[in-house]
A protein has these predicted regions:
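Membrane-helix boundary/interfacial segments in multi-pass membrane proteins
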Residues: 81-87, 201-208, 312-316, 345-366, ...
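Membrane-interface junctions at the ends of membrane-embedded or membrane-associated helices
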Residues: 5-6, 35-47, 177-180, 222-238, ...
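Membrane-interface helix-loop-helix junctions at transmembrane boundaries of multi-pass membrane enzymes
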Residues: 272-283, 349-363, 372-403, 453-460
Length: 630
């Protein structure tokens, strides 16, 4: 991908070239977007850029490995997160859904753009995965290829690292494209690439953790928000179309904010200039994003046309818009895994008393907060001095995000009217971070160039600059990168994974090939936990299984899947009779889903004659009882 803003001739986007002002905004009557600094360098990438980019990628890699303790092949082959028996952390359970998707996709069952069924889930049928839209099919498909290449757990680890590397690299290139100096672009890119947001969402929300397209949005927003807009069919127009289409292929939350701020910026410019071509260009960007969004939904929509709607598959209650709305104070709350025990303790204390919580990922980091406060200071100062045209565009963008997605904001009003898709407004904290970091790079680069005396600073000056850069990077790594797992925590994951793998192997050795296993407690899929059992915990044996079939995993809401819920209303003896009638060879029990650890159920099954020795996991939470009498 070439980000080179070559200056041979002015692009058709700009017909004249008035000088920019330092304050930002528009030069009065100019028709030229005003940069917060001089124009982009004559040659990009330069040797300094390549050295900085290579250093950036190495730094991000080492920081990521430090955060997860992945320093050898054995640790790379382990998941960085895995539910521990008896732990009802719903977010950590989501990683099992990720692993399930990658395994099924790697086996060829979940192909992009096609209807999706999984033969080994949803027994006695094939699991239907068509009613819940998968809006990130291309990233998921790439992840599945990584899982097939490196193994299920190692593949997702590689994907997580690539997400951080892409975020850092793209931000660096965008910052340099936006006239940022190499050093400031490096610092901001490191902060974005190691954002607490990405660490906290990976690996259980990998589609959310892929933040790398967001810096590209900043280019589009500036183009549409500044004169003369985007000239149709220019090089910039094609770049914007490509960015819009890329956004539509990724997480729908990011597609949403790209379209919102693109439309808002274009409408404001149209009100000032009445330039219909510029407005149409902005609408073309939104159309490109919409086209990709439609492509991602074709399988779901065509399945709906063929088999009717399933309103019960995807349920979004209004309460989550309140709970997971964007909250300004959460931008300042450190993560629970902060390297400072003092700050981590403060976060724990806050979460213990706060009535409304976020996804633990809104923290902007020290550098991000400094940039946010700087932007707020400049914007408020300009307003107080009645210099409204000097208020940075970025301040208005942040203001819109807060107005739209804060708890009780415009998004909540839409939710009250029935549109509850974007329930986690706190996820837009990463967009605020990207906006403020890039603004600080542009503004800081302007000041740096304005204060620079001569082109060849002396050794003392270079030493001061180098020390400042190193100090900033050390603060970022210390502040944003989570503390590494302890030996005890890693040993717990190893013990749980080994227990599940061995348990599944014993089931496959004891049951006929292709046998069906009925899972208790009865749970609906997706997003429906049971008391004591997180929503995707029943996927644990499937991750290590080769030929068994499991009752869990077909999407709820259709009559075909209702039989399990009806079964739960019968007596145990009647239920077992129905289970055997449908061809199941064993009953799998997660003991955590029963207040008495399912001991009465196991005792009753033995009394019914199913007295073959049960298969019990090493951790003691799983048991499998074959349904054949000795």
């Amino acid at each position: 991908m070439a980000f080179a803003p070559k200056r041979r001739r002015r692009d058709r986007d700009v017909e004249s070239a008035p000088r920019p002002t330092v304050a930002g905004g528009f030069e009065k009557g100019s028709g030229e977007p005003i940069d917060d600094g001089p124009e982009a360098p004559d040659r990009f990438p330069s040797r300094a850029d390549l050295v900085a980019l290579a250093t950036l990628l190495v730094t991000v890699t080492l920081a990521w490995c430090s955060a997860h303790g992945t320093w050898d092949a054995a640790s790379w082959a382990l998941p960085t997160s895995y539910p521990v028996a008896g732990n009802e952390d719903l977010e950590k359970s989501d990683v099992l859904g990720m692993f399930c998707y990658l395994k099924a996709s790697g086996e060829g069952h979940l192909r992009p753009f096609l209807w999706k069924t999984i033969p080994n889930l949803g027994a006695p049928y094939e699991a239907n995965w068509n009613d819940f839209p998968t809006l990130d099919e291309i990233p998921f498909f790439i992840d599945s290829l990584l899982a097939r290449t490196f193994g299920l757990f190692a593949g997702l680890n590689v994907s997580m690292l690539l997400g951080h590397l892409l975020a850092a690299a793209v931000f660096f290139c965008v910052a340099r494209w936006s006239s940022g100096t190499v050093l400031l672009s490096f610092i901001a890119a490191l902060a974005f690439g190691l954002s607490p947001y990405a660490f906290q969402h990976g690996p259980h929300h990998m589609q959310v953790a892929y933040t790398w397209p967001i810096p590209l949005f900043l280019l589009v927003w500036r183009w549409v928000s500044t004169e003369p807009g985007i000239v149709p069919w220019s090089r910039r127009w094609w770049w914007a179309i490509a960015i819009g289409f890329t956004a539509g292929l990724h997480h729908v939350y990011y597609t949403n904010i790209l379209c919102q701020l693109t439309l808002l910026g274009a409408l404001i410019q149209y009100r000032h200039r009445r330039s219909l071509p510029a407005l149409l260009s902005a609408l073309a960007v939104i159309a490109a994003a919409a086209a990709a969004f439609v492509l991602m939904n074709l399988d779901t929509w065509t399945y709906k046309l063929a088999y009717g709607a399933n309103d019960g598959a995807m349920v979004r209650d209004y309460q989550w818009l309140e709970l997971y709305g964007l909250k300004i104070k959460d931008l300042f709350i450190p993560t629970l895994t902060h390297r400072s025990e003092l700050l981590a303790g403060f976060s724990r204390s806050h979460r213990a008393v706060a009535p409304l919580l976020d996804e633990r990922a809104s923290y902007q980091g020290i550098v991000g907060l400094a940039c946010l406060l700087w932007l707020a200071f400049e914007a408020v100062g300009a307003m107080l001095e009645r210099r409204e045209r000097d208020v940075p565009i970025e301040a208005w963008q942040v203001f819109w995000i807060v107005l739209m997605f804060t708890t009780g904001g415009l998004n909540a009003i839409l939710g009250a009217a029935g549109f509850t898709l974007f329930r986690s407004g706190c996820r837009y904290s990463i967009v605020i971070m990207a906006i403020t970091l890039l603004w600080a790079v542009r503004r800081g680069s302007t000041l740096e160039r304005a204060m620079r005396i001569g082109r060849n600073p002396d050794a003392a000056t270079l030493g001061i600059i180098g020390s400042a850069v190193i100090a900033a990077c050390m603060v970022i790594v210390w502040d944003e990168v989570p503390r590494p797992p302890t030996k005890e925590e890693m040993a717990t994951i190893v013990r749980q994974v080994d227990s599940d793998r061995t348990f599944t192997a014993k089931m496959e050795a004891s049951l006929p090939e292709g046998a069906m296993v009925f899972q208790l407690p009865i749970m609906e899929f997706p997003e429906m936990p049971a008391p004591g059992v997180p929503p995707y915990d029943h996927f644990r044996p499937y991750l290590f299984s080769k030929n068994l079939r499991y009752s869990f995993g077909s999407m709820k809401g259709r009559p075909r899947e209702a039989w399990q819920q009806e079964l739960g209303k019968r007596s145990l003896e009647e239920a077992v009779t129905e289970i055997k009638k449908r061809g199941f060879a064993a009953i799998y029990i997660n003991r955590n889903g029963f207040p008495d650890r399912a001991l009465p159920v196991e005792k009753a099954l033995r009394a019914m004659g199913y007295s073959k020795p049960p298969i019990v996991s090493a951790t003691g939470d799983l048991v499998c009882i074959p349904l054949d009498k000795p």
